[in-house]
């Protein structure tokens, strides 16, 4: 089977990542400019959907349609709220800071699975790696929210 490729827009002069489809549009991150972009396949328009994302790369949606991101600059997993704020879901494991989360997925139980490599490019140079592993982790929702 042959595939045809389409360039959506000119190169961004930085890394793009985290494409996720919401049923109407494609969202992706422009990591170095701290933005989430939205591509509308009907009009062909690409607009800035959110700014100030602190090196967020991987994106996903849960069963309720909420958007989550791996905020490598904040060393956390966050949820982007509809009012423009963010909620930190996880930023530590056993009291130690996450490394630099990269990609994530949610499952039907509402759990968030994510990769946790060390990528010093996306954080302040004074930061240090606290976890002694680069792994896949799972965050389980707790009764207290």
Give the positions of each predicted feature.
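Sequence-structural signature of mature extracellular/luminal beta-sheet repeat domains
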Residues: 1-145
